Amino acid sequence: MEQPQPAPGSLSWRLSSHPITLLTFLGFRVSSLLVYLFGLLFTDNLVMIFIITILLLAADFYYLKNIAGRRLVGLRWWNEVDPSTGDSHWVFESSEPGSKVINATDSRFFWIAIYAQPLFWIALAVVAVFSFKFIWLPLVAIALVLTITNSLAFSRCDKFSQASNIAGSAFNGGNLAGSIASNMVGRFFTR
């Protein structure tokens, strides 16, 4: 008997447009948490757990910022520094509105994972404080900085993308009206 297919947008990686990208993204998101939580079961070396967790967090940050965000939801961001003034600002990039169709499953996985991970790290910070294991707080602080930075940047990037799409459609609509008006005026003077 054939099993029913999951509905589009449901949390099934099989519906993903980019399953390898999605699974790698989720693997990086989960691996740093797993090493932090269960690393002491395999080794008593706190420094090794610290280093492995930091490396996994850095890989997650890079992969999310440069690969997964672009492929899964069509968004990318980076920080630019003006060499003459030294001012830095964030630059947001989104795919063209008609050029890429965003898969609902990819989008749901992406946004759930991007907002859930900082919440997990906040919970782990609370656990570290209340269990008096302050040695873990620097690691949790680094994890929070990296995950919250990506969360904020992609949230702003998404808002920028939506605003650009609205402005672009209004601008294109204005061009259409302008071209119709200029054609009508042009015809009037050529007669």
Curated annotation (Swiss-Prot):
GO biological process: protein secretion; vesicle-mediated transport
Principal place of residence: Golgi
High-level lineage: Eukaryota, Fungi, Dikarya, Ascomycota, Pezizomycotina
Annotated keywords: Glycoprotein, Golgi apparatus, Membrane, Transmembrane, Transmembrane helix
Membrane topology: Multi-pass membrane protein
GO cellular component, one term: Golgi membrane
Bilayer-crossing regions: 15-35, 37-57, 109-129, 134-154
Protein's cellular compartments: Golgi apparatus membrane
Keyword Membrane part of the UniProt annotation: yes
Annotated glycosylation sites: 103
Role this protein plays: Golgi membrane protein involved in vesicular trafficking.
Protein name as annotated: Golgi apparatus membrane protein TVP23
A Pfam family matched in the record: DUF846
Protein family per UniProt: Belongs to the TVP23 family.
